[in-house]
Regions:
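Conserved ATP/PPi-binding loop(s) of AMP-dependent carboxylate-activating enzymes
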Residues: 374-377, 388-413
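ANL superfamily adenylate-forming
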Residues: 153-205, 214, 226, 306-308
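Conserved AMP-binding A3 loop
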Residues: 74-76, 203-227
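Gly/Ser/Thr-rich phosphate-binding loop
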Residues: 206, 264, 290-293, 307-366, ...
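Conserved AMP-binding/adenylation subdomain of ANL enzymes
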Residues: 226-243, 251-291, 305
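Conserved structural elements of the adenylate-forming
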Residues: 79-84, 217-239, 300-304
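Conserved AMP-binding/adenylate-forming core of the ANL superfamily
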Residues: 41, 45, 54, 62-107, ...
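A short helix-loop-beta submotif of the ANL/AMP-binding
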Residues: 99, 105-125, 129-133, 142-147, ...
């Protein structure tokens, strides 16, 4: 493409992004001092979790950012707690480029560890909470993180795997004590002063499914712009300062992606450590969530509840149920929308490329189970074994290009 063509394409994309972000309420009129704080945070931190919570703390200090089984946290509380945790990590010898493994379920500790890493420029490594001892050992040996943040329930597994790392407990029951430092103690008494941005932003390493052996690590840097988020919001009607129930695991690429979207929207994020179908409906209804983020098997388990239970909870506020992580059966999409309205979105993607296509409720009604179409900024091509494009209606290998693509594998089989 010629230089004038490239310029025209860039201008068009940025104009579309601006329009979408304004429509979603991410860009909105605000007090001059808060506008300045937002601009400074974006310039200093870039589009990172550290920037998002710094901005949200400035714009919505007293609004609730996280709801979990431990209670609620406002955006200002999250900002101060993650500052304290980042300082504690630094005091423990963790710095820019160092790895911090995170083995946590869905709760504030997972989020606080990720944001603290972002503030330091450290790299977050997400460990599957269903790992066996051999998988855990192999991944930790290969990735060589400097520290580990974990839930107390995994202490025995870590001890069996002989994990020799600086360890921090993110979630514990009152009667449990492994002797490791608790994050809750650090954030309650630590240094809450703002940190200086690192020279290079940290990365997130999300593990693949590991169907052929030890899960591979897929390194993912933060996107360089808001274009991918705007492209997603073009298809899924979410707006700023709404409430999202994230049932999908945060360590999974889909759960993490939607949390990233949520903090860009300054959403209130509702979490439950372990998935329970009825509890998910209850929390979604109780908090009047406008979005419920799931993987398809969660929809299946919800729909297996008896009719009386399904009718007990009012999901009238929900306008988007984004599902991803595996194939969505056609019968499942039809039954869900027949019960709860046309609010189901099916996203096809992978750990390596994030989302490739998005199916709207209209798409799913027309062709149940469809993967939909590529969002703006994503290119999907099918090629045969010789590297030639296949004709429409033919089968081929899928290639995806977008700003969310990963940088490469860290190893594994």
């Amino acid at each position: 493409m010629s230089l004038p063509g490239q310029i025209a394409t860039t201008v068009k994309t940025k104009s579309q992004t601006l329009a979408t972000l304004t429509r979603a309420g991410i860009i909105r009129p605000s007090r001059p001092d808060r506008v300045l704080q937002t601009a400074v945070a974006l310039v200093r931190w870039g589009p990172t979790p550290a920037a998002a919570y710094t901005i949200n703390a400035a714009r919505y200090p007293d609004e609730v950012g996280i709801v979990d089984e431990a209670g609620t946290l406002t955006f200002l509380e999250i900002q101060r707690r993650t500052n304290a945790l980042a300082h504690a990590f630094a005091d423990a010898g963790i710095g820019p480029g160092d790895g911090v493994a995170i083995m946590c379920r869905n709760h504030r500790g997972f989020i606080e560890a990720v944001v603290a890493c972002s503030k330091l420029g450290a790299n977050a490594l997400f460990l599957n909470t269903a790992f066996s001892k051999p998988q855990l050992t192999d991944v930790l040996e290969r990735e060589a993180p400097k520290a580990l943040v974990y839930d107390q329930e995994f202490a025995n597994l870590l001890d069996e795997a002989d994990v020799d790392l600086v360890r921090f407990i993110a979630w514990h029951e009152p009667e449990e004590d492994s002797g490791d430092t608790r994050i809750e103690d650090l954030v309650g008494t630590g240094n809450i002063q703002n940190l200086s941005p690192p020279k290079e932003p940290g990365k997130a390493t999300i593990l693949t499914s590991g169907t052929t052996g030890t899960p591979k690590g897929a390194n993912r840097s933060q996107p360089k712009s808001m274009d991918p988020i705007a492209a997603l919001l073009d298809r899924i009607p979410l707006k700023a300062r709404e409430t999202t129930m994230i049932a999908a695991p945060l360590f999974h690429s889909w759960g993490y992606a939607h949390w990233s979207l949520g903090i860009s929207l300054a959403s209130t994020v509702v979490l439950k450590r372990k998935f329970d179908p009825e509890a998910t409906l209850s929390l979604t209804a109780q908090h009047q969530a406008t979005a419920l983020v799931v993987v398809p098997v969660m929809l299946q388990r919800i729909l297996e509840l008896d009719d009386e239970t399904l009718k007990r909870y009012d999901l009238g506020a929900v306008k988007a149920v984004p599902a991803s992580g595996s194939a969505l059966p056609a019968s499942l999409s039809d039954r869900w929308m027949d019960l709860f309205g046309d609010n189901l979105f099916n996203l096809y993607g992978s750990t390596e490329v994030a989302w490739a296509t998005i199916a709207t409720p209209e798409d799913l009604r027309a062709a149940p189970g469809t993967a939909g179409k590529p969002p703006r900024g994503t290119v999907v091509k099918l090629y045969d074994d010789d590297g030639k494009p296949v004709a429409q209606g033919e089968t081929g290998r899928i290639f995806v290009g977008n700003e969310m693509a990963f940088e490469g594998y860290t190893g594994g089989g």
